[in-house]
Amino acid sequence: MHCPFCQHADTRVIDSRVSEDGATIRRRRECEACGERFSTMETVELKLPAIVKSDGTREAFDQRKVRAGFDRALQKRAVAEDKIEAAVRAVVHQLRISGEREVPSIKVGEFVMNELRKLDHVGYVRFASVYRSFEDVADFREEIEKLERDLPSSTEQLQLLGDVIALTKKKKG
């Protein structure tokens, strides 16, 4: 690797550390010509599948779009940044392990919804409302009821639909 300071071609690795998630290696290097030290990050480069949009056009996968979808769904929600990043990584991982050269955008949306469902139920319903083009309150109610049916039963678990109805009544009253 060329030294970023003097452009000399010979550098040596003096330390290597694997990141917490095991996906990146940080290498500390030293230039043999000028003695300057610098760090490099090494990751495996796997080609992600192309995304086939609903109109049939194809585009390269863009992780920023996935992140933007999470950000919109979770706006003003108390979800930790590291949890959102982990969810984005999970979507990317699902695409990588699919082994497909092309993936329909609808499948990416489903991956995002599955991660949101685990992360934040309100964010999940927000995303689902746009993704599935909800047209009225009945669509929201149906999705919330489906979500409640799938939740593990617990006396501590709040009833989503009941909470929504109670909030609606408070705002009207």
Curated annotation (Swiss-Prot):
InterPro entries: ATP-cone_dom (IPR005144), NrdR-like_N (IPR055173), RNR_NrdR-like (IPR003796)
A biological process from GO: negative regulation of DNA-templated transcription
Molecular function via GO: ATP binding; DNA binding; zinc ion binding
Cofactors: Zn(2+)
The UniProt record lists the keyword Zinc-finger: yes
PROSITE patterns to which the protein is assigned, alphabetical: ATP_CONE
Positions annotated as zinc finger (unnamed): 3-34
Domain ATP-cone positions: 49-139
Cofactor binding annotation: Binds 1 zinc ion.
Keywords associated with the record: ATP-binding, DNA-binding, Metal-binding, Nucleotide-binding, Repressor, Transcription, Transcription regulation, Zinc, Zinc-finger
Highest taxon above the source species: Bacteria
HAMAP family for this protein: NrdR (MF_00440)
Function: Negatively regulates transcription of bacterial ribonucleotide reductase nrd genes and operons by binding to NrdR-boxes.
UniProt similarity note: Belongs to the NrdR family.
Protein name per Swiss-Prot or TrEMBL: Transcriptional repressor NrdR
Source organism per UniProt: Stenotrophomonas maltophilia (strain K279a)
Organism placement in taxonomy: Bacteria, Pseudomonadati, Pseudomonadota, Gammaproteobacteria, Lysobacterales
Gene name, Swiss-Prot/TrEMBL: nrdR
